[in-house]
Amino acid sequence: MESPLQVPDRRSISVVTPVYNGEASIVELCRRLSEVLPQIATQYEIILVNDGSQDRSWEVISELSSHSATVRGLNLMRNYGQHNALLCGIRAAKYELVLTIDDDLQHPPEEIPQLLARLDEGFDVVYGAPKTEQNGLMRALASHITRLALRAAVGSDVAKNVSAFRVFRTQLREAFANYQSPFVSIDVLLTWATTRFGATTVVFQPRHSGSSNYTFTKLVRHGRIFSSTPVSSHAACKLGHCFR
């Protein structure tokens, strides 16, 4: 009898996590990921992208990387924003699927098999849609802006389920390989590559510690995702250093 965590057709997975002041949660996140991933993947990696944290996040990431061959660290020189950090991690991913998950433990790693099972139904992108939103006001407004922007591209049914807990086929990144702008929305970029979007309901958890990092300034920046200022997001991946 199969374990409840198993899904058909074990595959290779790159987990990408943008980290901003996440020193209190990333050790626990990696521990839980390391329990789930071996049961559902033949190969996996955990890419932690330090997005200009002001705490000891990079020191913790460095320590995790030095003790585990599956953990990789990318260190950005300053805070570029969640989606820019995600884009750097996505471009560094080496396995067939990319799964994005926040650093605050609101997205339970134990729910990953549900996303993969839904992907096996023929989708290219699958979101973990929360039964109940756990976000603060600014984060909720940012999510609302994203959903409004995506509605025309993917339809209202898909747009309402968009979240930062997502899995997609790594080959989709080829559609935005040359994208260069400081204003990045991973969800918009994914619409350049496919129309096969799906979702599955998962239970989000309260934040492990601290409060949301979304500020009014970040909210305004998030609302400008369609800007085309010719500054390379890809360059941000080079402005720092990485492990493995």
Task: Kindly give the residue locations of the regions a language model identified.
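Hydrophobic helical membrane-anchoring modules
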Residues: 1-9, 185-244
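Non-catalytic alpha-helical coupling and interface elements of nucleotide-dependent molecular machines
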Residues: 38, 66, 150-154, 195, ...
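Residues at alpha-helix boundaries and short interhelical turns
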Residues: 20-23, 68, 180, 194, ...
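Structured catalytic core of nucleotide-sugar glycosyltransferases
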Residues: 1-137, 149
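Acceptor/aglycone-binding surface of glycosyltransferases and processive sugar-polymer synthases
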Residues: 72-78, 82-92, 97, 106-188, ...
